[in-house]
Amino acid sequence: MRPGGALLALLASLLLLLLLRLLWCPADAPGRARILVEESREATHGTPAALRTLRSPATAVPRATNSTYLNEKSLHLTEKCKNLQYGIESFSNKTKGYSENDYLQIITDIQSCPWKRQAEEYANFRAKLASCCDAVQNFVVSQNNTPVGTNMSYEVESKKEIPIKKNIFHMFPVSQPFVDYPYNQCAVVGNGGILNKSLCGTEIDKSDFVFRCNLPPTTGDVSKDVGSKTNLVTINPSIITLKYGNLKEKKALFLEDIATYGEAFFLLPAFSFRANTGTSFKVYYTLEESKARQKVLFFHPKYLKDLALFWRTKGVTAYRLSTGLMITSVAVELCKNVKLYGFWPFSKTVEDIPVSHHYYDNKLPKHGFHQMPKEYSQILQLHMKGILKLQFSKCEVA
């Protein structure tokens, strides 16, 4: 063969190899990652399906240039976060076979995903809530939605009714009292021990409206972690009975304790159980007699029934919704932006540090973890979809 012909043949071979490489690598890389995920799902028989999805293999990242590498890394993170959302949705309906450590790994993965509010997701979810429940009009009992003569059914003891006579009717506000609705930024503050040393107090207090649950402490050293601002706080009637002696001999202590809440609304489930009614009314009359700055509101039992039905369609089948999920649902309807603090159903942090059940006591949760609360998995989904934001760890302090 002539020397020139050999050189041409060599160049042709090199061009062919280069062409094959260009055709093979870019087009195949994403598909290859998907195949690996599917193969992993089929081959990993000992791992629950949702966790296999969340642990799908990483795509090999080409390092031709810094910009290419960063773009590929960003795309991989996006794909990982989409898989994560799918995994959360799948385990929300099936919790057997998962350990607490599995869930903490999922939380760790969630924290690696950048959070961004998704206006369309928020609007769609809020519209569904409003269609079923309408917190804006029906969240609390008012003179507008409950006229004199109404036979009101209890939320849980639904076969029992209470007639709304004038002496009860005058306890209700004329209309819904949330005059600045919709609020721009709302904080729903749970009581989880994860708030200890979080330094979230300043951030919470900057919110336009702050919801709290069951008269938690907000003064002293804890304020740097939980804030002190309160616009609405729920009261479980049992705390009135157990801590404040049904407002008989400990009425003065109750009035002293509630002074820290300023002009907040006190929200009670007066019409959930018949046993709650008298105690809730006692709180109303105690505040009225003492000319306290706080105002008493009552959960509307029909709103709570409708809300329970709404969440039941999403797999939450508990005997009764937690106060935290009730208030979170209300906040989504009343607020444009919702952030949750102190929601943590685990016995330890992702760093394996024990967490007390409440931020104001040293009691640890019962040993062992049987299943992740269905409610919390729903809240995680709302976080992943950009409908609300969960604060998992310490807050950033300027």
Swiss-Prot record:
Lumenal side: 25-398
Cellular component per GO, a single term: Golgi membrane
Catalytic activity: a ganglioside GM3 + CMP-N-acetyl-beta-neuraminate = a ganglioside GD3 + CMP + H(+); a ganglioside GM3 (d18:1(4E)) + CMP-N-acetyl-beta-neuraminate = a ganglioside GD3 (d18:1(4E)) + CMP + H(+); a ganglioside GD1a (d18:1(4E)) + CMP-N-acetyl-beta-neuraminate = a ganglioside GT1a (d18:1(4E)) + CMP + H(+); a ganglioside GD1a + CMP-N-acetyl-beta-neuraminate = a ganglioside GT1a + CMP + H(+)
Molecular function via GO: alpha-N-acetylneuraminate alpha-2,8-sialyltransferase activity
Pathway terms, separated by semicolons: Protein modification; protein glycosylation
Keywords, comma-separated and alphabetical: Disulfide bond, Glycoprotein, Glycosyltransferase, Golgi apparatus, Lipid metabolism, Membrane, Signal-anchor, Transferase, Transmembrane, Transmembrane helix
EC number: 2.4.99.-
GO biological process: blastocyst hatching; carbohydrate biosynthetic process; ganglioside biosynthetic process; N-glycan processing; oligosaccharide metabolic process; protein glycosylation; protein O-linked glycosylation
Glycosylation site residues: N66, N93, N151, N196
Main subcellular localisation: Golgi
InterPro entries in alphabetical order: Glyco_trans_29 (IPR001675), Glycosyltr_29_Sialyltrsf (IPR050943), GT29-like_sf (IPR038578), Sialyl_trans (IPR012163)
Cytoplasmic side: 1-3
Chain residues that bind substrate: N214, N236, P237, S238, S322, T323, G324
Active site residues of this protein: H370 (proton donor/acceptor)
Spans through the membrane: 4-24
Membrane topology: Single-pass type II membrane protein
Stated family: Belongs to the glycosyltransferase 29 family.
Cited function: Alpha-2,8-sialyltransferase that prefers O-glycans to N-glycans or glycolipids as acceptor substrates. The minimal acceptor substrate is the NeuAc-alpha-2,3(6)-Gal sequence at the non-reducing end of their carbohydrate groups.
The name this protein goes by in its record: Alpha-2,8-sialyltransferase 8F
